[in-house]
Amino acid sequence: MNTVQILVVILITTALSFLVFQLWYYAENYEYILRYNDTYSNLQFARSANINFDDLTVFDPNDNVFNVEEKWRCASTNNNIFYAVSTFGFLSTESTGINLTYTNSRDCIIDLFSRIIKIVYDPCTVETSNDCRLLRLLMANTS
């Protein structure tokens, strides 16, 4: 045998030994690995098979806003109508009125944190309008 063959045999033997030791270590700790996976499986990220699932941790419109008044939030009136509000105004489907109202806070939050392009309606261009008074009331109740 020449030196090249000896080196190849040593390399293959080392690789197989390493593989055997890894498999042995895995088999020895199999119960611990299963317990670990059961304990911490809720912390791992997984894609959902549900098409309608919105991962609210991925997109947050408040990530780059540092002023508390400018952060978007869901606020409700006394009659349980929810609005997505900020000092910029209301989220709406058009820029001429409040067209997005919600019957529960969950729907408001899902719509607020979705990636859909949103239109902001600023009612306070006319300071005396009813919509501007509603916005100020909602902002006073949530800040």
Swiss-Prot record:
Q: Which domain of life is it from?
A: Viruses
Pfam families of this UniProt entry? Answer: Pox_A28
Specify the species: Amsacta moorei entomopoxvirus
Q: Key word RNA-binding present in the record?
A: no
Q: What does this protein do?
A: Envelope protein required for virus entry into host cell and for cell-cell fusion (syncytium formation).
User: Sorted alphabetically, which keywords does the UniProt record give?
Assistant: Disulfide bond, Fusion of virus membrane with host membrane, Late protein, Membrane, Signal-anchor, Transmembrane, Transmembrane helix, Viral envelope protein, Viral penetration into host cytoplasm, Virion, Virus entry into host cell
Per the record, the coiled-coil ranges are none
This one is known as Envelope protein A28 homolog
Q: Where in the cell is it found?
A: Virion membrane
Q: Does the keyword Magnesium apply?
A: no
Q: Which GO terms describe its biological process?
A: membrane fusion involved in viral entry into host cell; symbiont entry into host cell
Fetch the InterPro entries from UniProt: Poxvirus_A28 (IPR007664)
Q: Per the similarity annotation, which family is this?
A: Belongs to the poxviridae A28 protein family.
Question: What spans does the record annotate as topological domain Virion surface, numbered to this chain?
Answer: 22-143
Primary localization: virion
* GO cellular component, as recorded: membrane; viral envelope; virion membrane
According to the record, the segments passing through the membrane are 1-21
Q: How does it sit in the membrane?
A: Single-pass type II membrane protein
* PTM field: Contains two intramolecular disulfide bonds. They are created by the viral disulfide bond formation pathway, a poxvirus-specific pathway that operates on the cytoplasmic side of the MV membranes.
